[in-house]
Amino acid sequence: MASGSGTKNLDFRRKWDKDEYEKLAEKRLTEEREKKDGKPVQPVKRELLRHRDYKVDLESKLGKTIVITKTTPQSEMGGYYCNVCDCVVKDSINFLDHINGKKHQRNLGMSMRVERSTLDQVKKRFEVNKKKMEEKQKDYDFEERMKELREEEEKAKAYKKEKQKEKKRRAEEDLTFEEDDEMAAVMGFSGFGSTKKSY
């Protein structure tokens, strides 16, 4: 049919940016020359490792269906996308391993070394945690006790209701049993020749 008429460029292959890779190669060559010449290469100063101040989002895409085509950007494809390292990880455990790993931390500009805490910092942290625990315990004790009392009351009510229902059921069974015996005696069916006495 119309093989050349009105078609757009449907080439989905990745195009390499030659200029960018040329610059990287030149940079690597200059570093190698400096090593050979005996000049020490300046080590990159990295920050000490610090904790995250945000929550890692693992559940926003959970249960959603996404249509993926060849033109879909990598960040929207299946799995967890790391925008710092520009990579996709397929499951949450590997994603957590990745964001806690060396490569990711290096791309963030941090080393894997942790700042050494001083004695004062440790004491302050203990005080803060102790205050939190005391506040939590006070709230927890009162709320928990009230909850337990309510549950005990509900159980006692349910137990009483069950006993009353059983009492009623037994009384009804006794009445129907006695009526059946009387009816059988009137009709002449009492006992059917058994020697066992009914009480």
UniProtKB/Swiss-Prot annotation:
<dbReference type="InterPro" id="IPR003604">
    <property type="entry name" value="Matrin/U1-like-C_Znf_C2H2"/>
</dbReference>
<feature type="cross-link" description="Glycyl lysine isopeptide (Lys-Gly) (interchain with G-Cter in SUMO2)">
    <location>
        <position position="55"/>
    </location>
</feature>
<keyword id="KW-0507">mRNA processing</keyword>
<feature type="cross-link" description="Glycyl lysine isopeptide (Lys-Gly) (interchain with G-Cter in SUMO2)">
    <location>
        <position position="123"/>
    </location>
</feature>
<dbReference type="GO" id="GO:0071005">
    <property type="term" value="C:U2-type precatalytic spliceosome"/>
</dbReference>
<feature type="cross-link" description="Glycyl lysine isopeptide (Lys-Gly) (interchain with G-Cter in SUMO2)">
    <location>
        <position position="61"/>
    </location>
</feature>
<keyword id="KW-0832">Ubl conjugation</keyword>
<comment type="function">
    <text>Involved in pre-mRNA splicing as a component of the spliceosome.</text>
</comment>
<dbReference type="InterPro" id="IPR040107">
    <property type="entry name" value="Snu23"/>
</dbReference>
<comment type="subunit">
    <text>Component of the spliceosome B complex.</text>
</comment>
<keyword id="KW-0539">Nucleus</keyword>
<keyword id="KW-0747">Spliceosome</keyword>
<keyword id="KW-0863">Zinc-finger</keyword>
<keyword id="KW-0238">DNA-binding</keyword>
<feature type="cross-link" description="Glycyl lysine isopeptide (Lys-Gly) (interchain with G-Cter in SUMO2)">
    <location>
        <position position="8"/>
    </location>
</feature>
<feature type="compositionally biased region" description="Basic and acidic residues">
    <location>
        <begin position="150"/>
        <end position="173"/>
    </location>
</feature>
<feature type="region of interest" description="Disordered">
    <location>
        <begin position="27"/>
        <end position="46"/>
    </location>
</feature>
<dbReference type="GO" id="GO:0003677">
    <property type="term" value="F:DNA binding"/>
</dbReference>
<feature type="cross-link" description="Glycyl lysine isopeptide (Lys-Gly) (interchain with G-Cter in SUMO2)">
    <location>
        <position position="36"/>
    </location>
</feature>
<keyword id="KW-0007">Acetylation</keyword>
<dbReference type="InterPro" id="IPR022755">
    <property type="entry name" value="Znf_C2H2_jaz"/>
</dbReference>
<feature type="cross-link" description="Glycyl lysine isopeptide (Lys-Gly) (interchain with G-Cter in SUMO2)">
    <location>
        <position position="70"/>
    </location>
</feature>
<keyword id="KW-0508">mRNA splicing</keyword>
<dbReference type="InterPro" id="IPR036236">
    <property type="entry name" value="Znf_C2H2_sf"/>
</dbReference>
<keyword id="KW-1017">Isopeptide bond</keyword>
<dbReference type="GO" id="GO:0005654">
    <property type="term" value="C:nucleoplasm"/>
</dbReference>
<keyword id="KW-0862">Zinc</keyword>
<dbReference type="GO" id="GO:0005634">
    <property type="term" value="C:nucleus"/>
</dbReference>
<dbReference type="GO" id="GO:0008270">
    <property type="term" value="F:zinc ion binding"/>
</dbReference>
<dbReference type="GO" id="GO:0000398">
    <property type="term" value="P:mRNA splicing, via spliceosome"/>
</dbReference>
<dbReference type="Pfam" id="PF12171">
    <property type="entry name" value="zf-C2H2_jaz"/>
</dbReference>
<feature type="cross-link" description="Glycyl lysine isopeptide (Lys-Gly) (interchain with G-Cter in SUMO2)">
    <location>
        <position position="39"/>
    </location>
</feature>
<dbReference type="GO" id="GO:0046540">
    <property type="term" value="C:U4/U6 x U5 tri-snRNP complex"/>
</dbReference>
<feature type="cross-link" description="Glycyl lysine isopeptide (Lys-Gly) (interchain with G-Cter in SUMO2)">
    <location>
        <position position="64"/>
    </location>
</feature>
<feature type="cross-link" description="Glycyl lysine isopeptide (Lys-Gly) (interchain with G-Cter in SUMO2)">
    <location>
        <position position="45"/>
    </location>
</feature>
<feature type="region of interest" description="Disordered">
    <location>
        <begin position="150"/>
        <end position="175"/>
    </location>
</feature>
<feature type="zinc finger region" description="Matrin-type">
    <location>
        <begin position="80"/>
        <end position="104"/>
    </location>
</feature>
<feature type="cross-link" description="Glycyl lysine isopeptide (Lys-Gly) (interchain with G-Cter in SUMO2)">
    <location>
        <position position="102"/>
    </location>
</feature>
<keyword id="KW-0479">Metal-binding</keyword>
<feature type="modified residue" description="N-acetylalanine">
    <location>
        <position position="2"/>
    </location>
</feature>
<protein>
    <recommendedName>
        <fullName>Zinc finger matrin-type protein 2</fullName>
    </recommendedName>
</protein>
